[in-house]
Amino acid sequence: MKFGKLHEFIYSLSTQDKYSEFDPKKSFNRVNTQETELLFSHHNQSTASLIGGPTNDVDSTVNKNQFDGVHEVRLAWRHIKNWLLKYSPDLNSTLQSPCTDADLSDFQKDLNIKLPNCLIEFYKITDGQSYFNDNGSGGLVFGLKLMPIDEVMVMTEHWRKVADYLNSKLLHANQTNKLQELSKLETSHANSSQLKFSSSNLDLIEPVKIAKQQRHESAGSPNIPRQKSIPPGTIHDSFAHPMWIPIITDEVGNCIGIDLCPPTNGGGTWGQVILFGREFDNKYLIADNFGDFLLIFANDLEMGNWDFRSSLANNNQDLLIGSEGELVFVEKGTNKEIPYLEVLKKRCIEKWLSSLNESNSEKSEEIKHLIKDLNSNTSSILKFKNSMDQFVNNNISSIEGISDPIIHSENQIAGGSDNAKNQVKLGETSDTKQDDTSKIASTVSTSDEDE
């Protein structure tokens, strides 16, 4: 017993493992008990009846795509790392040391998954970001945090609770033939007040999903949108799935993750990168593998689609001295600041629509309805003709122009404003230079005469 403690102490001093433990049974991360293995096996087998089709033969798909994206990860990271060293040492300092083989092995056992080799290669380069020394620099991916594997494990468990809850509800509704119960399930982020996220404590309470059901109405409940995927059929039409593994997060419930269980014969690939979360009723396919996604991010950096937003230390808006600020996506040429999730979403839609035009095939009614829905729900942030700052300033100006009913002497205020403007014009055009004291005295005397 004593020798075991001694060996454990020596292990803690000498190992480079961060996730893995000397005694796996005592690990805080050990969540994969025999019961949970059966649970996730049930998820994989029961997905067919709950989300519209049988699952893939995972083993054959894994063998086919196991090396996809590995070279791309190495190439993209070389460009990203060089960019960080040149432009953002603060962001570079948030990157953690690599994961060990033991870390990645235990991580996959805990979640009962096999990671794509390109993602394993990436975590052998860096274990995501740490916020202990971020200096206000924020997330690496244009403000989005690249999570270490321990945070990935915790967030995946939360999303699996979401999927388990929804599957049990849908299964109960199907077994009892009470389809009216489906209309009581909130499926949109806009209607759900019970889905809560925070950076320190991710709580998913009474989460929701719908699976290929038409819109339903119920007393006291508005029409609830279906969950859809872009392109259609590439991702399961569900709010959550136990085999969606979040990798990058905005820390308010939206994620960029990998899909380890795409629909059969739907055009998706094992290990594809998708966009999902509480604000996305539509799920978006943004890359075939994680290596391709990193190349997209690296290309945006190389193209100059970036800027740094000044960081604030506290509510008094004191600037952090020496801080680079948060990396944000700024469209080159227009100088528009756009959330990166919206950028990826827009590109996915444009690529899909372009493929439809190239095929010249007749669009089905479902495709036409989906295109119409996408056009009607396009985020207003993509329609700004000016920068984000200009948009905010215009709204502030319109607010300032509204009359305040509390003020009684509006005419006096307007008159005082006109007098002040006249004084400024006189001061600007006068050939005689006056000091600040004489200008103030002149302004006061003029105001007294008006009164």
UniProtKB/Swiss-Prot annotation:
Residues 410-422, 439-451 have a biased composition (Polar residues). SUPFAM superfamilies: SMI1/KNR4-like (SSF160631). InterPro entries: Knr4/Smi1, Knr4/Smi1-like_dom, Knr4/Smi1-like_sf, KNR4/SMI1_regulator. Gene3D superfamilies: SMI1/KNR4-like. Residues 410-451 are annotated as: Disordered. GO terms for biological process: fungal-type cell wall beta-glucan biosynthetic process; regulation of fungal-type cell wall biogenesis; regulation of mitotic cell cycle. Residues 428-438 have a biased composition (Basic and acidic residues). GO terms for cellular component: cellular bud neck; incipient cellular bud site; mating projection tip. Pfam families: SMI1_KNR4. Belongs to the KNR4/SMI1 family. This is KNR4/SMI1 homolog 1.
